[in-house]
């Protein structure tokens, strides 16, 4: 017994020197393996969408959705969506979301995606709301009622149809890479908490809050789109309908004002004739 315990000590020491890796739970579907993206073909998972070192989301040229899956039960997702504003068409909003974690396929055909808690990120951007976008942590477990993989009759490539928990479909995605384009399948930005640590005093709390505020300002300056929160080369293309509508409206307004002024000038000329 003592010999076995001594033999196990080096293994315990080595295991403490390396970070813990997550093992995917539940069955995976090898047919899902790869990177899938929607029709715009501009949104892909991986380093092109999220930089974990700088903790920064990178805005693609066009909106879209991308999912990647591995054969051993890991996934990653990238969302870039435009949201119209019916009351102010010139002020559309944009949402970017990044998550990764594990997935499993249930016996009934449903699929459950469980993200790593500390890694999800969300960016909400509104050109009319302020100087900077809102950048926060984001964690949302997803349940898909079912999914199907088939050959698209038009593009002749593999297509992935995913149906949300209520049966509503996501936009169809097409296989872009058989080798998944994604980050390492473990937590990228862990949050460290110490149990039993003494509570900070009021002074130290103020110092921490001041440092956090300074970091937030630095992060906003670096990442918060010092220029317009929504770039012209993505949302303007996506929201052409609303922009053209506003342009037509402004042109009509101008024409109306010009007509009113000319009518007024003509009336005055007749009066003083």
Curated annotation (Swiss-Prot):
Q: Which InterPro entries match?
A: Rot1
Is Transmembrane helix there in the keyword field? yes
Q: List residues traversing the bilayer.
A: 251-271
This entry's Gene Ontology molecular function terms read:
unfolded protein binding
Which UniProt keywords are given for this protein, alphabetically ordered? Endoplasmic reticulum, Glycoprotein, Membrane, Signal, Transmembrane, Transmembrane helix
Q: Which residues are glycosylated?
A: 108
| Lumenal topology ranges | 25-250
Tagged with keyword Repressor: no
Which Pfam families does its entry note? Answer: Rot1
Q: Which GO terms describe its biological process?
A: 'de novo' protein folding
Membrane topology category? Single-pass type I membrane protein
- Coarsely, its chief localization is endoplasmic reticulum
Q: Which residues, if any, are the signal sequence?
A: 1-24
Q: Where in the cell is it found?
A: Endoplasmic reticulum membrane
Task: Show the GO cellular component annotation of the record.
Answer: endoplasmic reticulum membrane
Q: Which family does it belong to?
A: Belongs to the ROT1 family.
Q: PANTHER family attached here? A: PROTEIN ROT1 (PTHR28090:SF1)
Q: What does this protein do?
A: Required for normal levels of the cell wall 1,6-beta-glucan. Involved in a protein folding machinery chaperoning proteins acting in various physiological processes including cell wall synthesis and lysis of autophagic bodies.
- Protein name in the entry: Protein ROT1
Q: Which organism is it from?
A: Ajellomyces capsulatus (strain NAm1 / WU24)
Q: What is the lineage of its organism?
A: Eukaryota, Fungi, Dikarya, Ascomycota, Pezizomycotina
């Amino acid at each position: 017994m003592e010999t076995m315990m001594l033999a196990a000590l080096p293994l315990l020491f080595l295991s403490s020197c390396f970070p813990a890796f997550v093992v995917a739970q539940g069955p995976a579907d090898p047919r899902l393996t790869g990177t899938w993206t929607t029709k715009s073909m501009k949104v892909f998972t991986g380093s092109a969408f999220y930089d974990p070192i700088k903790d920064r989301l990178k805005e693609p040229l066009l909106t879209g959705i991308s999912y990647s899956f591995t054969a051993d039960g890991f996934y990653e997702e990238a969302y870039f969506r435009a949201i119209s504003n019916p009351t102010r068409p010139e002020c559309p909003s944009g949402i970017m979301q990044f998550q990764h974690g594990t997935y499993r396929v249930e016996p009934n055909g449903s699929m459950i995606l469980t993200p790593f808690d500390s890694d999800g990120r969300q960016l909400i951007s509104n050109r009319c709301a302020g100087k900077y976008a809102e950048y926060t942590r984001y964690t949302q477990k997803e349940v898909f009622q079912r999914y199907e993989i088939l050959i698209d009759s038009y593009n002749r490539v593999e297509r992935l149809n995913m149906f949300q928990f209520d049966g509503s479909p996501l936009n169809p995605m097409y296989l872009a890479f058989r080798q998944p384009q994604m980050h390492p399948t473990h937590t990228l930005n862990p949050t460290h908490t110490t149990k039993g640590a003494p509570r900070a005093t009021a002074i130290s709390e103020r110092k921490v809050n001041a440092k956090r505020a300074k970091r937030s300002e630095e992060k906003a300056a670096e990442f918060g789109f010092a220029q317009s929160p929504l770039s012209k080369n993505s949302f303007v293309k996506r929201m052409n309908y609303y922009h053209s509508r506003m342009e037509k409206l402004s042109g009509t307004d101008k024409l109306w004002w010009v007509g009113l002024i000319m009518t007024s000038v003509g009336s005055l000329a007749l009066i003083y004739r």
